[in-house]
Amino acid sequence: DLQLHHREFIDTCRAYLGRAQTYSAVWDQDFVALYEKMECPLLLMAAPDDVLYPYLDRAHKMKPGSIVKPVEGANFEPDHDPDATAAAIKSFLNI
C-alpha cells in the first residue's frame, strides 16, 4: 500500500533518530563522484530561492549535456510551481 509506506516513511523521517539517519544517508554520500559517473540524460531544475540553486550552474558545467530549467517555488517547486515543473519534465521526456 503506497499511502501506508509513504506515511511510515514520513513518520520515520520526523522521528529524532530517523531524522539523523536520513540526513546522514544523504549528506554522507560522495555526490560529486556519483554525479560524474552518471551517463543518462539529465534535467536540472531549481528555483532562485531554492537552497540548491547556487549549485545549478556547477552541476550544469560538470555535465554540459544536461538541460537546465529554472522554475519557481523555493524548496517546494512541484507544489508551488507545478505548471512549470510539469512542463519542464514533459519537454525533457518529449511528451
Predicted regions and their residues:
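A short acidic, amphipathic alpha-helical/loop segment
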Residues: 34, 55-58, 84
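Conserved loop-alpha-helix segment in the C-terminal half of the alpha/beta-hydrolase fold
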Residues: 41-79
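Conserved alpha/beta-hydrolase catalytic His-Asp/Glu region
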Residues: 1-35
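Post-His helix in hydrolase/transferase enzymes
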Residues: 78-93
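A structural signal for well-ordered alpha-helical scaffolds and beta->alpha junctions
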Residues: 16-19, 52, 82
